[in-house]
Amino acid sequence: MCLTKDLNLLGSYETGFDMEKSIYNILTIDRWGSLNHMDYRQARLRLVHGKLALKFLKWVVKQPGLETDHIVQLVCITTHILVRARMYDPARHILKELSLMSGKSSFVFGALMTTYRLCNSNPSVYDILIRVYLREGMIQDSLEIFRLMGLYGFNPSVYTCNAILGSVVKSGEDVSVWSFLKEMLKRKICPDVATFNILINVLCAEGSFEKSSYLMQKMEKSGYAPTIVTYNTVLHWYCKKGRFKAAIELLDHMKSKGVDADVCTYNMLIHDLCRSNRIAKGYLLLRDMRKRMIHPNEVTYNTLINGFSNEGKVLIASQLLNEMLSFGLSPNHVTFNALIDGHISEGNFKEALKMFYMMEAKGLTPSEVSYGVLLDGLCKNAEFDLARGFYMRMKRNGVCVGRITYTGMIDGLCKNGFLDEAVVLLNEMSKDGIDPDIVTYSALINGFCKVGRFKTAKEIVCRIYRVGLSPNGIIYSTLIYNCCRMGCLKEAIRIYEAMILEGHTRDHFTFNVLVTSLCKAGKVAEAEEFMRCMTSDGILPNTVSFDCLINGYGNSGEGLKAFSVFDEMTKVGHHPTFFTYGSLLKGLCKGGHLREAEKFLKSLHAVPAAVDTVMYNTLLTAMCKSGNLAKAVSLFGEMVQRSILPDSYTYTSLISGLCRKGKTVIAILFAKEAEARGNVLPNKVMYTCFVDGMFKAGQWKAGIYFREQMDNLGHTPDIVTTNAMIDGYSRMGKIEKTNDLLPEMGNQNGGPNLTTYNILLHGYSKRKDVSTSFLLYRSIILNGILPDKLTCHSLVLGICESNMLEIGLKILKAFICRGVEVDRYTFNMLISKCCANGEINWAFDLVKVMTSLGISLDKDTCDAMVSVLNRNHRFQESRMVLHEMSKQGISPESRKYIGLINGLCRVGDIKTAFVVKEEMIAHKICPPNVAESAMVRALAKCGKADEATLLLRFMLKMKLVPTIASFTTLMHLCCKNGNVIEALELRVVMSNCGLKLDLVSYNVLITGLCAKGDMALAFELYEEMKGDGFLANATTYKALIRGLLARETAFSGADIILKDLLARGFITSMSLSQDSHRNLKMAMEKLKALQSNKKD
């Protein structure tokens, strides 16, 4: 301190030593006021002076009335004193307080600068200030001090500059290291080796290894020899960037430069190699250390032991432990924990426990980590008895059981189904004052979801909210996945929406799970729309996403849509997998596009490894199901030619196809031949096919034989086999034989299943055994089996067959109320029955129910309703049904429209009939000439000859060719009205239209002529008919005989008729007499008898 004040009152002190002694005495007794009366002079400061300055500062700041500026000045003076007295730590502390008190770095610098010359200080005070700022992470402030120092002609030391450089690099501040270096050189601050080390580290971190090598060369040329730190820095980055060859070359370069690698160098290299899963090379470096006489330490061995343990090579890790012990090195917790974890991962609990006890024998107390590793491994491998023992041991030894250990145990218990014990452990965890985290709760939720206890999982989610946590993305994904797995798709979507609202990031796993579930539920269009929405939200579908959607369309048989998605998939750059191709082929096969499927399979042979046994099996199975066995056998041969070996499924598919076609004997021979060649072994599925085929063929004894053969070969018949037998008995009408099969089903996967009951229900329903059907339905409910649409159909079928239609409707309503799916076939059956019984209103009510359930009308339903409505003269309702069919894209049969036109004409509503005719033409139900002809016939049938004739002429004028039936009907009306000549004129018109008479037309004209007594012309037509290749029927002969018998005079035609009747076998020669009239009467009786028998 350089204060020069003279006070006359203390002039008696003659020497400097006496003055110093007096000041010291006054200061030590805290009589600060006496200092104002003393005379000062310049002297070198020592440690004691710094201490006194601090003591004085503490006294001053406690004095009242001091202004901030005075305090700052005193603090700065004290800092200068401390720096000159080399008391750097107190100086740092004061500067830290001053920087916090003042805020701005420029203010602190200015305050120090103001007192700098007063105290004859030195620049190191600013070095300390810079380091204070760096230690507090205030890099910008340190750079500001560096700048201000330059303005006043001061330079910090190179060590301070290195500290700034190092801090800038670590912090990642937006400050250029190279700009700072340039400023250093500009201010002639000479860099040292440490400076170069920092710069080399920066270049290596950026991957600029060439520049770092150049800098090292520049460093050497400038007289700075790279140290071990320099080389270690470069080696570290070589290893981190995977340039291990360059690292080894640098090691050799170090040796050539006389810089020996130390144990830290090798430890760093080994650590980086192990982290990059190159543990074998790390072990070679250990051997290299030995050769270079560098002794590995505990860190070296721990790194390698941990690396080998993580890689599953615990035996090598154990050998390294023995080597470590042989060199006198002491393994620590890290060593044993790695070995315990390694042995546990391999499932070798005996060795893991040996390591644990060895650790204790070495005097090392197992830590929470040691126990945690052991407990986690034991729980994962379901060794819960051992785990419980070590858990209690931790408690006894006072080792704190932490959150990670508890979570590991809870996770292991949950994964192995010990959920209640997991909950108990959770409660113990809370009692120990350890709050479960989101990972702990996630393990519990996953465990409960896995076993289907979804309600409990949701309760745990509520508990998460109660403790102030929020479910993370993993928990949401777990809930969504398990909801989808259990078929609760609506709940899964609701959870997904909650996940979005919570702001969690959607991942591909959750996305693909939802897409797959939507496809499985048959909602493939919704799945595609969901994928579009995800794409618009920025989550692009991956290959799995596209595969899920293509598979969905494939399963539903929508091959074209599957290919559309495939095109989009390839367009965005995703490569199809063998699963993609399989789904596309499946889509074509299920959609019935077998020819296209065959072509697609052939094209896939050009794609490497795309065609395998599964692909061929897909197409072969589809061919078998479609009944195209020849093609299936051809595909089988093609497989063998292409060296694609058929598997058990291939043979089973072919055998099943043959059995379905009733070629069970061929299937058996094929199976025996394949078995003899060693291509396939007899299996349960194969014999089930034989049993099913034999029973369906009515060969129930042969079916029983194959059932017994299954037992002899050790293939226990399952419920599928028994169901095949029950179905066979039911089809043969021998359903009573199933009573012997039902008791033995108790041992087959829990007894009769829904398929069993449905088969029995259908069988008893066809027999109209309603009471047994209801007993079977009661058994379904009592056994906890959910009925399906087939159950409903079979039960309603029996009731309908028993003419209890009203009860059938009530049962249908009950099924719908219970949420059972009812199919279109059940509705069609009931609607047809309602229509047949004349209960049209009931039929319409059923149609309304169908519509409300989203089941559209089909052609069979509509046709049945139209027919009954027409019969009951409810023509307006009939038109409504026909219109509804058109709206739904169902093309009604033309005969339904024709029936409606006939009915309308019959009741005299000609105007509406013409409207319906126009609708037929407009909707393209049939060609215009057919529609117009139908109108002609309808008018003729209701006796409106003039209108019919007028319409016929209009048709001819419009160049529309009437049908033969319309001409025939009009000719029949003419003949009926006695206008045979007009009928014959119509025949001429027919001929002009290019139409020929058919058998009915000939019969109409012949009957009309006979009725008029014109037998000559009638027989002329008869001969013409025979010439056109038509064989006369009973109607023809009866008309001719009736005409002949009505004649009073003989006619030669009688002999012709009798001769033809005799030739055709209608009469015999034994029954003929000489009287033609009598013979004709006898022939008439014979013909009447024949027609009567035919009607019966």
From Swiss-Prot:
Per the UniProt entry, the signal peptide is none
Query: Do the record's keywords include Glycoprotein?
Result: no
Q: Where are the PPR repeats?
A: 122-156, 157-191, 192-226, 227-261, 262-296, 297-331, 332-366, 367-401, 402-436, 437-471, 472-506, 507-541, 542-576, 577-607, 612-646, 647-681, 683-717, 718-752, 753-787, 788-822, 823-857, 858-892, 893-927, 928-962, 963-997, 998-1032, 1033-1068
Q: Which UniProt keywords apply?
A: Repeat
The family annotation for this protein states:
Belongs to the PPR family. P subfamily.
Indicate what this protein is called per its UniProt record.
Pentatricopeptide repeat-containing protein At5g55840
Q: Which organism is it from?
A: Arabidopsis thaliana (Mouse-ear cress)
